[in-house]
Swiss-Prot record:
This is DNA primase. Pfam families: DnaG_cat_HB, DNAG_N, Toprim_2, Zn_ribbon_DnaG. It comes from Staphylococcus aureus (strain MW2). The gene is dnaG. The keyword Glycosyltransferase does not apply. A zinc finger (CHC2-type) spans 38-62. GO terms for biological process: DNA replication, synthesis of primer. HAMAP family: DNA_primase_DnaG.
């Protein structure tokens, strides 16, 4: 069934595309529009634009974009109906589930969506088992003793998997789900001898793991009785891939954008406690190193990343390794060094929330400053290490994109080598590494001097090298996009088959369909009438094409005449063929060509 158009319009009107896109892309204002790195493909310079006035977005690289619905479809790989429902939930507009082809029999087309639905349904039962059953009391007490309030447990969706081999299995089976699919989703395990299925998580506190869109895609089950392993995580599945997921990103995205900084912690428990303490831009990996996929996504939100790992040797080693890699990828890297032997949870437990947030705010160092402070003893007592680390730190500072931050780092690092900031700066110039010093730097965006490379002017490929007739077609369509009256006055004046540019021909047809249902042209509404990225790009490019506000006298008529020249050329060709048929005396051909000429002339009248 079709969704009522009034519902679609209400959702679209209540959803601001700038706010929506900003949750996924770090945008900078450029003139009247906003620009950022495209979320749909990897690129070195920004080519993804958002128009707040027109409520559309468009990538001039991969051609993807559109209005709020099409952006949501692309970013989440879902259908139009699902996008409408999701955005409706976002702005509190009810969408009739039955009328939009959703049903309660879990007959969802995508296996991935079924896997997500399984996780979200079982979460409700895990939560119930934790908070409402006798079996969950011990686990609940364990959490409460560690500072988890009832409100926090509910907010995070924390639950309890009973000590039963078929709690999850039986629940999903009763709901009509494919047990094999539940196994592939990581909720069940399988006995490889008899191929029987049983619950993967038993007698554990269950922490839901969500993707960037806030959908549950996995679990981390924590023991509260001392059993091993301490944490049992979901296995790699089609919906749960650790290299692509950052814990808490769905909640932290807005704060990351607002603060222009992301804080990376070691584990999700640290994230929960830090978030509760007031640090809202925190995320963590799922027990893995920061991957290239993680970095690519982070760069689209911010270029500033702060590392706050545990205050032990392993945490220090991880900070040095991760920070070095991030610096090489063009990010501004900072470090918060926790007291020895402490993690964020322990710091908060000992000193309180206010002390923790103050510590985070006031004890932040550049990566270069942190690195040299860790290596200071070796630098002071080993001349070979002195030379080695002098070159390393010089290069690290040279990678910093801000000249102000570079100068601050020079001032902080120079005393550790007993040199002046000026001498260290000279060392940087002397040992300046070539652009390909780090061959794995795939992100680009900066020249060999650390300067930001401005994006090249955006060109509209389909508007390059247009013929005289195509230019007339473009201007004609632009005027038709101005208002419905103009369209109605001139629609019958042109035969669509006379368009030489096929994209323009399709736009002409789209305008007909659009004005059949709308009285006023709006690009955000119009893009809903096209299905291909190429045609969508043409429509958006026409919208951005500048033409005089009001047509001069007979201007549109002139464009019509030029477009119809194609039809005139056809008549001239028919006249030529008629003369040739007359010359050779073929009466039948003469009659045929004469009929064609008469028909063509009638079309023009």
């Amino acid at each position: 069934m079709r969704i009522d158009q009034s519902i679609i319009n209400e959702i679209k009107d209540k959803t601001d595309i700038l706010d929506l896109v900003s949750e996924y892309v770090k945008l900078e204002k450029r003139g009247r529009n906003y620009i950022g790195l495209c979320p749909f493909h990897d690129e070195k310079t920004p080519s993804f634009t958002v128009s707040e006035d027109k409520q559309i977005c468009h990538c001039f690289g991969c051609k993807k974009g559109g209005n709020v619905f099409q952006f949501t479809q692309e970013i989440k790989d879902i259908s139009f109906v699902e996008a409408v429902k999701e955005l409706g939930d976002r702005v509190n507009v009810a969408v009739d589930i039955e009328a939009t082809q959703f049903n309660s029999n879990v007959q969802i087309a995508s296996d991935d969506l079924q896997m997500i639905e399984m996780h979200e349904l079982i979460q409700e039962f895990y939560y119930y088992a934790l908070t409402k059953t006798v079996e969950g009391e011990q686990a609940l007490t364990y959490l409460q003793e560690r500072g988890f309030t009832d409100a926090l447990i509910k907010e995070r969706g924390i639950g309890f998997a009973p000590d039963s081999s078929h709690f999850c299995h039986d629940f999903l089976q009763k709901k009509g789900y494919d047990i094999e699919l539940a196994y592939e989703a990581g909720l069940l395990s399988r006995n490889e001898e008899n191929f029987s299925y049983y619950d993967r998580f038993r007698n554990r506190i269950m922490f839901p793991l969500k993707n960037a869109q806030g959908r549950i895609v996995g679990y981390s089950g924590r023991t509260y009785t001392g059993q091993e392993p301490k944490y049992l995580n979901s296995p790699e599945t089609p919906i749960f891939q650790k290299r692509k997921l950052l814990y808490n990103l769905d909640k932290a995205r807005k704060s990351i954008r607002k603060l222009d900084e992301i804080v990376l912690l070691e584990g999700f428990m640290d994230v929960i406690k830090s978030d509760t303490a007031g640090l809202k831009n925190v995320v963590a990996t799922m027990g893995t190193q920061l991957s290239d996929e993680h970095i690519t996504f982070i760069r689209k939100l911010t270029l500033n990343i702060t590392l706050m790992f545990d205050g032990d040797f392993a945490g220090s080693e991880a900070t040095l390794k991760t920070g070095q890699h991030l610096l090489q990828q063009g990010l501004n890297v900072f470090v918060i060094q926790l007291p020895s032997g402490m993690d964020p949870d322990e710091y908060i437990g000992k000193y309180g929330n206010d002390a923790f947030t103050a510590f985070v705010k006031n004890d932040k160092k550049s990566f270069a400053h942190y690195k040299v402070s860790i290596l200071k003893d070796e630098i002071a007592h080993n001349d070979l290490s002195y030379e080695r680390y002098l070159k390393e730190l010089s290069h690290d500072i040279s990678l910093m994109k801000s000249s102000i931050l570079q100068q601050k780092a020079l001032n902080d690092v120079a005393p550790f080598f007993n040199v002046s900031p000026e001498q260290l700066a000279n060392e940087i110039q002397f040992n300046q590494a070539p652009a390909n010093y780090y061959p794995d730097d795939e992100y680009g965006g900066y020249d060999e001097y650390g300067g930001y490379i401005e994006p090249e002017p955006i060109g509209m490929a389909q508007f390059d090298n247009l013929s005289r007739q195509e230019k007339a077609e473009r201007a004609f369509l632009k005027h038709l996009m101005r208002d419905k009256d103009t369209f109605l006055n001139y629609y019958e004046s042109v035969d669509k088959d006379n368009f030489t540019n096929q994209h323009f021909k399709y736009v002409f047809e789209v305008l007909h369909d659009f004005y059949a249902e709308n009285d006023q042209y709006n690009i955000s509404d119009a893009v809903q009438y096209v299905n291909s990225n190429e045609l969508r790009e043409t429509l958006i490019s026409l919208e951005q094409y500048n033409l005089n506000d009001e047509p001069y006298e007979n201007e549109i008529d002139d464009y019509v005449n030029v477009i119809n020249e194609k039809g005139q050329e056809t008549i001239e060709s028919l006249n030529h063929k008629l003369r040739e048929a007359t010359r050779i005396g073929d009466v039948e051909l003469q009659k045929y060509y004469l009929q064609q000429i008469v028909a063509k002339n009638k079309e023009r009248m």
